[in-house]
Amino acid sequence: MVVNLTISDFTWDGFTASWSPSGGEFDSFVIEVTNLENFAESQNLTLSGDAFSLGISGLNPNTSYMVGLYGLYQGSFVEPVYSEATTGGK
């Protein structure tokens, strides 16, 4: 299970996502960033199972995004966690 998805360090084109896994070691994590204005997937990134944060940039300013975090555990994705984040202005 992945818990405590936190968004911090906001900039005009991005932010940092960090999380705390519990219940065992994960094979990998997938972060999906979706623009909430047009529901287009902005980024889909795969990280190693020992990564617990990611700086995300290259997004649109003053835009709301949904950040989804999926953990791959023993070959299966566990229930994802989500957090909403809004980039700042230039």
Where in the sequence are the language-model features?
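Extracellular low-complexity, O-glycosylation-prone stalks/linkers
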Residues: M1-N60, S64-K90
